[in-house]
Regions:
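Conserved beta-loop-beta/alpha segment of the NTase-like Rossmann-fold superfamily
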Residues: 1-50, 78, 86-89
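Catalytic-core segments of class I nucleotidyltransferases/pyrophosphorylases
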Residues: 20, 53-151
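Terminal low-complexity segments of carbohydrate-biosynthetic enzymes
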Residues: 147-161
Length: 161
């Protein structure tokens, strides 16, 4: 997961299509999951599964507390009534509305499903450094921006050194 292919190896992702197909006509929500290394579990929300149902979530667990190596990767298919359901969640716990409270509610009801999205490039945008890396990679992969952006980036790096 932490190893990225060169930008020349880019092909469009089918992860969203795969997630929608996995969701089908289910009640509740389906979330994308990626398998991470044992050392990386402490950086993500990690889930336990029973078939395709998520039965437990642990936010940034230690290796010994992690129920698996399956991490929530920020791709979701939520039902049409999600906005109304979010309004019933408390602001107090996180200081704003977060979907994790709603996901836990669906999990408790047996309506939170997971789909492993292997063979997919995953960018973790949880830190400024990894967010910037994702932006640079995406810019370099775009035929309309990549060549000019690469030239500019090379000049900036030369100026920086």
């Amino acid at each position: 997961m932490d190893v990225h292919a060169p930008t020349s190896a880019y092909t469009p992702s089918l992860a969203s299509k795969r997630l929608i197909a996995a969701h089908g006509d289910r009640e509740g929500a389906t979330v994308g999951l990626m398998e991470v290394s044992e050392e990386a579990v402490q950086r993500y929300g990690i889930v336990a599964m029973d078939g395709d149902c998520i039965v437990d979530m642990v936010e940034k667990p230690s290796v010994s507390e992690a129920p698996s190596r399956l991490a929530l990767c920020g791709r979701y298919v939520f039902p049409h009534n999600t906005k109304e359901a979010l309004e019933t969640c408390s602001y107090e716990e996180h200081g704003d509305l977060q979907s994790i409270a709603l996901q836990k509610r669906w999990m408790d009801q047996g309506h939170l499903h997971g789909a492993v999205l292997d063979n997919t490039q995953w960018y973790d945008s949880g830190s400024p450094e990894t967010w910037l890396q994702a932006q640079v990679d995406h810019a370099l992969r775009r035929p309309d921006l990549g060549p000019a952006f690469a030239h500019w980036l090379e000049q900036r790096l030369n100026d920086y050194r």
